[in-house]
Amino acid sequence: MRLDKFLVDCGVGSRSQVKTFLKKKQVTVNGQVETSPKTQIDENQDQIAFQGQSLTHETFVYYLLNKPQGVISATEDARHKTVLDLLDDTARHKQVFPVGRLDIDTHGLLLLTNNGDLAHAMLSPKKHVDKIYQAKVDGIMDQEDILAFEKGIELKDHTCQPSKLEIVSVDRDAGTSLVQITIAEGKFHQVKRMVAACGKEVADLQRLKMGPLSLPNDLELGVWRRLTQEELDALTVFGIPLT
């Protein structure tokens, strides 16, 4: 493997930044300063260090983000803050992207990775990957709504697949409901439109689960972390190489 590719994979910087670091003699291979980006190295045997810090090669990385409201699920945008803006420089240089999208005013679990095959598998309609949302609803949701979800909500442009509506609590004095909704699709504003089709309105929407991944209770809004080994093991169900 070329040294510059190794350094980019490790999140040291972009390819052009890496060339600058090499010129400044900030990279060593087996203890010797190396300045050529074309140098061939063995990522499993050679000891590579940047600014004195030893590096370990990673082809793919996986970050779990508790996305806040007001941030869009994109890699770049001229008007809005993106989920990549919440990462540090090292994580951003891994060239990750969000797996699927959450609306700008929806918060909760979002997976970021640079593994395109895994993202494709998790988003494929053929895989029927369940997403679980918790919604605060203006209006009282009832058994009739549960049956409508089970049957498949009819929207103007789409009949939704059968889904699950669970009523967590109801405040009749305030005229509000707290519900959990499980869907396998990911159409535009789908949960909000499904609730609206029942004559109610989503006031707040949070994603709790996507496939085998769950939003950790201790992960604060706007904070991200690497997936644990247990979470990575759970992703093997998709049959995609993760390393």
State each model region's role.
Residues M1-T243:
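Basic, flexible Lys/Arg- and Gly-enriched helix-loop patches that mediate nucleic-acid binding at interfaces
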